[in-house]
Amino acid sequence: MGGLKKPKKKYLAGKPKKIWNKQLLLEELQLMGEYGLRNKKELWLARARLKWIVRRARALLSMTAEERAPLEVPFKEKLYKMGFIEDPNVPLDRILSLDVRAILERRLQTLVFRMGLAKSIHHARQLVVHGHVLVAGRRVTSPGFLVPRELEDKITIEQ
């Protein structure tokens, strides 16, 4: 019988090395207010996801054209389906220039607010947490749910 793996935190890749950097603190505070994040862990999770995307794009850029071709198209299509890029034919350099806002814009909480279904970003979070938001007919209670592009227009409010 094997032992259980020690659980790892999923946000460590996005956690800053120097937590008490004043400029970073102000930037994080501004992002938390703009996107209605409850704590910095939510921001760090988004940064970790972005870091994974950038690392993958950088690895693809370092490959030769023959090695890159079969891997590049599915990677770009996945990013397009998730809504992180606006066109599946963008060059890899544009993927490297993504920032954390691209990830935060795809959160269910943000999309509910941007669609005008809630009065404020905090109201959107409350609607999601209390189970009033349906995505393609299914109740989603996680405000951090990353909405794929195909489900974006299937977000509804149930009162």
UniProtKB/Swiss-Prot annotation:
GO terms for molecular function: rRNA binding; structural constituent of ribosome. SMART domains: Ribosomal_S4, S4. Residues 106-158 form the S4 RNA-binding domain. CDD domains: S4. PANTHER family: 30S 40S RIBOSOMAL PROTEIN, 40S RIBOSOMAL PROTEIN S9. It comes from the Archaea. This is Small ribosomal subunit protein uS4. GO terms for cellular component: small ribosomal subunit. InterPro entries: Ribosomal_uS4 (IPR022801), Ribosomal_uS4_arc (IPR022802), Ribosomal_uS4_CS (IPR018079), Ribosomal_uS4_euk/arc (IPR005710), Ribosomal_uS4_N (IPR001912), S4_RNA-bd (IPR002942), S4_RNA-bd_sf (IPR036986). Gene3D superfamilies: RNA-binding S4 domain. Part of the 30S ribosomal subunit. Contacts protein S5. The interaction surface between S4 and S5 is involved in control of translational fidelity. Keywords: Ribonucleoprotein, Ribosomal protein, RNA-binding, rRNA-binding. GO terms for biological process: ribosomal small subunit biogenesis; translation. One of the primary rRNA binding proteins, it binds directly to 16S rRNA where it nucleates assembly of the body of the 30S subunit. With S5 and S12 plays an important role in translational accuracy. Belongs to the universal ribosomal protein uS4 family.
